[in-house]
Amino acid sequence: MSGAYDESAMSDETTDSFWEVGNYKRTVKRIEDGHRLCNDMMSCIQERAKIEKAYSQQLTDWSKRWRQLVERGPQYGTLERAWLAVMTEAEKVSELHQEVKNNLLNEDLEKVKNWQKDAYHKQMMGGFKETKEADEGFRKAQKPWAKKLKELETAKKTYHMACKEEKIASAREANSKGEASVTTDQQKKLQEKVDKCKNDVQKAKEKYEKSLDELNKCTPQYMENMEVVFDQCQQFEEKRLNFLREVLLDTKRHLNLTESQSYATVYRELERTIVSASAQEDLKWFSSVHGPGMHMNWPQFEEFNPDLSHAISKKEKVKRNHDGVTLTQVTHGAEHGTPQTGDRGSVSSYEKNQQYSAEWSDDEQPPTAAQSASETNGGNPFEEDSKGVRVRALYDYEGQEQDELTFKAGDELTKLEDEDEQGWCKGRLDSGQLGLYPANYVEPV
């Protein structure tokens, strides 16, 4: 404050009241706190937006992974469609949470940022214009009353000191009457001292009472002036409180997906797809595609035709890839109009659209060592170590054919070749056995 009065020149018996000199500073500080609270609100919204973004990405990754697993797996028909609908739900909910993130950042956070910029004006020397105006308003309102208060404190102190001096003088004068060593002249001087002190006490008391009366007279005006400035601060704070309340309501509206029509539609569609799954329909489909309902070209008597002698028999259609793994190309017709699935790798021994050899023979034997050697050009199969990649099994797998590997979840093996178009990889167990396994049954070590 100015040199007219000193805030420290107050009685030790002060209270925590707003009306005490300097206690208006808490109201001024509230303005600065309001600016900081706007920053806190923006940080809060920003952190929630990061959570929404992360959750959205997790849903997308989860959906992508499991859609691939289900599509490659042995599940079929309407139940497969229902299962995949759960992935569709995740994708749509992911989009909704991404939208939540965008609304939080582009609407709620920006709204607080713009309001804060309009409400608080920084000064070149630091602080805010609103804080300075409030502080100066309180100082001006308090200055006359604080000056009178300082005069009152001085008068009070003088009065109390005079009372103390009068008490000491009276005690000395009373004690001197019982002492023979005190002369009459000394006794007279002590009495005069007492009289003077009493006179000083009376004067100090009158001045003290006058100062108190003057302070009381200016107190109503002091209170009125202080309340005017305080009300201005209250109005400013009211705007901030109402604004942040509005922001919180907007934030709630953006976060509450249960109020979103799009969110409700996602789960209506999911339920409709799941409910539409039919075991009977799936069983009928499987029977017609892979069971007794399949078309069959039953053997019939055929006359010899020399023009067809060059035709390739079914057995000659069997091809061998460079691994020595037999793949057949027997294709079933669609006479019954049954739907055909795409060529996708399987996560089980049964594949969608898996093709099996149409030939069998009592003479079939496992390939001999000589045959294996010829298929590898006489090379050592273990020489492939240098290009192998170590992988770990995610699930148990029981090989269904001689050229398939068998392993347990957690086992490690070496991947020798990347996934082929049917979703299989060539690998080698630590025992040295070579064979095929489903690509999505393992992960890199």
Swiss-Prot record:
- Coiled-coil annotation reads 146-167, 183-219
Please state the protein's primary subcellular location.
cytoplasm
**Protein name listed in UniProt:** Protein kinase C and casein kinase substrate in neurons protein 1
Provide the species name. Answer: Danio rerio (Zebrafish)
SUPFAM superfamilies the UniProt entry points to: BAR/IMD domain-like, SH3-domain
Q: Which gene encodes it?
A: pacsin1b
Domain named SH3 is located at: 386-445
| Residue span of region Disordered | 327-390
Per the UniProt entry, what are the Gene Ontology biological process annotations, in alphabetical order? actin filament organization; auditory receptor cell stereocilium organization; cilium assembly; cytoskeleton organization; endocytosis; neuron projection morphogenesis; plasma membrane tubulation; positive regulation of dendrite development
Q: Where is the composition biased (Polar residues)?
A: 338-358, 368-379
